[in-house]
Amino acid sequence: MKHKNDLKIKIDKEPKKKDNILKRIVIIAILLFIVIFVLNKAENYLKEKTANEINLVLNNKNVTANLKHEIIEEDGNIYMSIDDIKNYFDKYIYIEDEINEIVTTYDKQIASIGFETNKLTLNGATKKIYAHAIKKDDVIYMPIVEMKDVYNLETTIVENNVILDSLTRKQVKAYAKSNLSVKWKADFFSKTVDKIERGDVVVAIEEKDGWTRIRTENGNVGFVKSTKLTNYTTTRDDWEEEKQITGKVNMFWDYYSKYVQAPDRTGQVIEGVNVVSPTFFYIDSNGNLKNKIGESGKKYIEWAHSNGYKVWPAIQNDEAGIKVTSTILNSYTKRQELIENIVDVCVEYQLDGINIDFENMYQADKDKFSRFIIELDPRMKELGVVLSVDVTAPDGDANWSLCYDRNVIGHVADYLIFMAYDQYGASSTKPGTTAGYNWVETNLKKIIEYDEVKADKIILALPFYTRKWKVNSNGELVEKPSVVSMLNIKIPNGVEKQWNEDLQQYYIEYADGKDTVKMWIEDGTSITSKVSLVSKYGLAGTSGWRKDMETSNIWTIINTELQKASN
């Protein structure tokens, strides 16, 4: 049997052991905290993750850690991978097999660079450079400094930092009042990433809560107290392209064949209109760009400009046909020849814009048509010429609908024009409306939501016509429908118009012998409903197909609705 005193001794010793363990834990925790604090806060102790690499500082941000491949140096040249160029500069960059060169576009530039010779082709002109594209470890690299004119860059190389500044972005510089430590964070206890001396020039990026984020001459980015900087100077402002049209676009196509002269519109003033698109140009059966301007076309341009209308002529491919169009689209050389010819006519006739109206193309050529638009766009921007591209409704025929990549076209071109008509067209096997409101809205939403085209880049094209359908007692078509201009719609005496709420238009039918005539009416009422979509979805405006098919009240109706949408 244990003595009571022995039990007491054991009980007294247990708390002392626990106290010692607790003290040790506290001491270890304090030491760990001190070590972590020193490692994270002590000046210049921590090295950047990218300290041993070539760092890329793009528009005041070190993006090295986000690159797919390292920046490399070969023979004194700095190279950036094509994958990273695609990420930061040109999502559409690609290797053109026909010429074995990389083709890239950016803003007002289209360029190609090869793998063997030190030359760069920029907007059609070739110049000598000091490097070419290379392939290393199955990765394609481009000499980024040599590409500065393509991507509008100011390039600086300091030690292991490659500094790229977009010339279209605002830049503010300032002077250091005294010797300073540049901090990783806006905190005196943060680690130092660089040191600057009194009088050093820095790029002032942004100011917040008494601290200014800066970039040093070495390319390092960090924070200093705002009071330690002086003599702020804006060396460059943000550059934004001015829109040619203020407010909503109110446009029409002015069609005429190559066998007649351009319309004489002398003395005409069309209410609210600010853009005209005469069908001046076409691709012939040999794939050549032809113009039918002549003296009458020159007078047309003078008339339009005298009224303040911008001239965006259409280029059509209907005469070329699907095969010739395919031949052009599938050849880089032929695309560039066509683009050079378009540039020439834009300069010669002082055009304000170009409307690409290519229809009936192979679905297989969808990406090639997109390439044509991608390559045409910078050349038009270089001239200050607006690029608009016509597309049909999604989810239709392979050669009339599925041949367009509306997402790419909408991203690249200034305007995507949705030809919101021919819901039931010449090839339809049953009668129907030319452009029912519900169909127009449904397809418009597809373009905005599914194809992700910004609404303010979409011009809604309206039909100034309908079709006259004739069916037998079985409801079968007895002949191809005829096009009837809005101006020439005739409703026989005694025939009542029937309103269709979904279509937002009137419908008529009447007997013609043993057959029945059916017509869905396009008039001021139906046009008003469709134009209201501009306001509802924030669209860029409207265009009418085509001039001289409309009734006299249409321009007042369109102008009124567009004015509402502009407010």
What are these regions (language model features)?
Residues V276, I356, L416, L460, ...:
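Conserved, mostly hydrophobic/aromatic
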Residues G199, W211-T216, V224:
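SH3/SH3-like beta-barrel fold
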Residues K2-D209, T235-E242:
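Primary recognition of N-terminal secretory signal peptides and signal-anchoring hydrophobic helices
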Residues Y232-N341:
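Glycan-recognition patch characteristic of GH18 chitinases/ENGases
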Residues Y255-E271, N330-E348, A398-N407, E522-S535:
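Short, acidic/polar
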Residues F464-K530, N559-N567:
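Glycan-binding loop/region signatures in secreted carbohydrate-active enzymes
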Residues K530-N567:
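Acidic/aromatic/glycine-rich contiguous surface patches that form carbohydrate-binding/processing clefts
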Residues N286-E295, E340, Q363-P492:
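Substrate-binding surface in catalytic domains of secreted glycosidases
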